[in-house]
């Protein structure tokens, strides 16, 4: 579903464990890592798309997770020119994303990267909360920074305050 500005509606999924770590997944056959994400189909709500993508990409069902929060608004990023398919109609110039923060309620053994037979990812691991902001491909970095900042009070109430106070202290020097 591409809007009149050329942005494809998409959902992003951040899965956290009880230790405040987040699931970080490697794209199949590539060296790039990212959060699970995927398009919103016509007639589908963002929450419905999130649950569909959650199963397709990491094999988790609604009973395996709890929604903690979602972004207040859609966050956008533009694709680099080399990734824009000019021959497709309408032309997609980027993604507009609704993000969801999920708590894994089940054992991590429920995660199955091959649940649908055409895996998006070939590996995953738990990483520290802020790690993905530094590691994601550059054109997604601003969106990752915004979503992580918005979700920090929910995902890491104590660590979030500590992270921000450390940053402030560092700037005064």
Swiss-Prot record:
Keywords: Hydrolase. One of its GO terms (biological process) is mRNA catabolic process. The keyword Repeat does not apply. It is an enzyme of class 3 (hydrolase). Its cofactor is a divalent metal cation. Residues 6-149 form the Nudix hydrolase domain. PANTHER family: M7GPPPN-MRNA HYDROLASE. Belongs to the Nudix hydrolase family. RppH subfamily. HAMAP family: Nudix_RppH. This is RNA pyrophosphohydrolase. The gene is rppH.
């Amino acid at each position: 579903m591409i809007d009149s500005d050329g942005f494809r509606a998409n959902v992003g999924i951040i899965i956290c464990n009880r230790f405040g770590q987040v699931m970080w997944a490697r794209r199949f056959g590539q060296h790039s890592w990212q959060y699970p994400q995927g398009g919103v189909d016509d007639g589908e709500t963002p929450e419905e798309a999130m649950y569909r993508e959650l199963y397709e990409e990491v094999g988790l069902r609604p009973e395996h997770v709890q929604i903690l929060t979602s972004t207040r608004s859609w966050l956008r990023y533009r694709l680099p020119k080399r990734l824009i398919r000019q021959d497709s109609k309408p032309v997609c110039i980027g993604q507009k994303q609704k993000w969801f923060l999920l708590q894994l309620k089940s054992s991590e053994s429920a995660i199955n990267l091959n649940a649908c037979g055409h895996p998006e990812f070939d590996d995953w691991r738990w990483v520290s909360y802020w790690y993905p902001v530094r590691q994601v491909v550059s054109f997604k970095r601003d969106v990752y920074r915004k979503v992580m900042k918005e979700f920090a009070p929910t995902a890491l109430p104590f660590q979030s305050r500590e992270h921000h106070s450390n940053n402030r202290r560092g700037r005064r020097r």
